[in-house]
Regions:
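Active-site environment of non-heme Fe oxygenases that use a 2-His-1-carboxylate facial triad
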Residues: 1-25, 30-32, 36-42, 78, ...
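Generic structural signal for well-ordered secondary structure
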Residues: 38, 53-56
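N-terminal accessory beta-strand-rich subdomains and adjacent acidic, glycine-rich linkers
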Residues: 43-51, 58
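Short amphipathic C-terminal alpha-helix that caps PH/PH-like domains
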Residues: 56-67, 209
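Mid-sequence acidic-hydrophobic segments that form the walls
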Residues: 66-70, 124-127
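Short secondary-structure capping/junction motifs at helix and strand boundaries
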Residues: 68-78
Length: 279
């Protein structure tokens, strides 16, 4: 398989050929492929046949199933979300992925108890070359001092739950920004807007985290037929503002959330519609 694996510092892109990956779906190499890319902050699957494939969504879903179980949150649309920003829309109640305002660095669903492990973005069109900004956890941690990391590891932060979820409480329960997983590696679950902090020290720690993350961005510009898979535990992602006189930008994506272990959600996972619930 034409795979280029890099360390988490984003010096290179990881590129996987779609045809060869598709052929591996039922092969004995499936687990090897998954484990090989597990801890990368992102990778690209190239040459997805969007022009010739009349079953784009079904094939996209099958490819994402290589990494785990596609999921959705019960309050946020379909399992495959169509992302086509409107540059003229800026209402706070409109999800950021559907308007033209700057999308600051964040991890996906950080206000949920178990956020998805991956976000897969299939590029349908991108005439304006609008990229996805990615900042890698390893680079971030290298540039933060130990005391700041300790503060970010405290259960001292409540993250804003966006209005479109219709949740009665505006913020999640107290959680850390950074935590260690079962493998001893750091996970990162952050949304910088609307964070409530226990102390001023914790607020300053978040400001340091944001500064370092913003200073170490890699922009990934996807072409039609490329799937960008972002490791939601190992990186933050965002997008610059989209300006256009047109009602809709030329950038159109399909998005799927992926979980490595849906059983961990317990009774908050509905197998019939592949949906998680709660915060």
């Amino acid at each position: 398989m034409n795979t280029f694996i890099t360390s988490g510092n984003l010096n290179k892109e990881n590129l996987i050929n779609y045809t060869e990956l598709k052929n591996s779906i039922y092969s004995s190499n499936k687990r090897i492929i998954i484990e090989e890319i597990l801890n990368q902050s992102f990778f690209l699957i190239d040459e997805f046949p969007i022009d010739k494939n009349s079953e784009i969504d079904e094939t996209f879903l099958s490819i994402c199933s290589l990494l785990g179980s596609p999921i959705k949150h019960e309050k946020e649309g379909d399992i495959i979300m169509k992302i086509k920003p409107n540059p003229l829309e800026s209402k706070a109640s409109t999800p950021a992925y559907n308007n033209g305002v700057k999308f600051d660095l964040h991890s996906e669903l950080p206000y949920v108890h178990l956020p998805p492990d991956y976000i897969a973005l299939l590029c349908i069109s991108n005439e304006q070359n609008i990229g996805t900004n990615i900042s890698n956890i390893d680079t971030i941690l290298e540039k933060l001092d130990g005391s700041t990391i300790d503060l970010l590891s405290d259960k001292a932060y409540k993250v804003l739950i966006p209005p479109h979820f219709g949740h009665t409480d505006s913020h999640s329960e107290c959680r850390p920004m950074i935590s260690r997983n079962a493998n001893g590696m750091y996970d990162l679950h952050v949304r910088f807007d609307g964070i409530l902090c226990d102390t001023n020290e914790h607020r300053v720690a978040v400001e340091k985290l944001k500064k370092v993350a913003d200073e170490n961005i890699k922009e990934i510009i996807t072409k039609p037929g490329q799937i960008l898979v972002i490791n939601n535990r190992r990186s933050l992602h965002g997008r610059r503002a989209i300006t256009s006189d047109a009602r809709y930008s030329s950038r159109e994506l399909r998005r799927i959330y992926i979980s490595r272990d849906v059983q961990a959600y317990g009774d908050k996972y509905n197998d019939k519609n592949m949906a998680i619930s709660g915060f």
